[in-house]
């Protein structure tokens, strides 16, 4: 049997989800909405491509914004 030639896999570098100048804050609603699902749930770290520290800070910021009624707890737009 012939062996297939080994192809080099190009590593696609993804852009970081949070740019260096952006600050995770409960008042930054545009940033927070990027990490919520359509139903209003917080997306997982694996889906968001965040570090553990960033995910914890993001979760706290989202919860603070929900308590202050800046973003809804659930999106029930039917």
Swiss-Prot record:
Gene Ontology MF terms: small ribosomal subunit rRNA binding; structural constituent of ribosome
Ranges of Basic residues composition bias in the record: 1-16
One GO CC term on file: mitochondrial small ribosomal subunit
GO biological process: one example: translation
Region named Disordered: 1-20
InterPro entries recorded: Ribosomal_bS18, Ribosomal_bS18_CS, Ribosomal_bS18_sf
Signal peptide stretch: none
Coiled coil stretches, renumbered: none
Localization annotation: Plastid, Chloroplast
Keyword Plastid among record annotations: yes
Gene3D superfamilies: Ribosomal protein S18
Keywords in alphabetical order: Chloroplast, Plastid, Ribonucleoprotein, Ribosomal protein, RNA-binding, rRNA-binding
Domain of life: Eukaryota
Complex and partners: Part of the 30S ribosomal subunit.
Family, per entry: Belongs to the bacterial ribosomal protein bS18 family.
NCBIfam families: S18
Listed HAMAP family: Ribosomal_bS18 (MF_00270)
Name of the protein this chain belongs to: Small ribosomal subunit protein bS18c
Upper lineage: Eukaryota, Viridiplantae, Streptophyta, Charophyceae, Charales
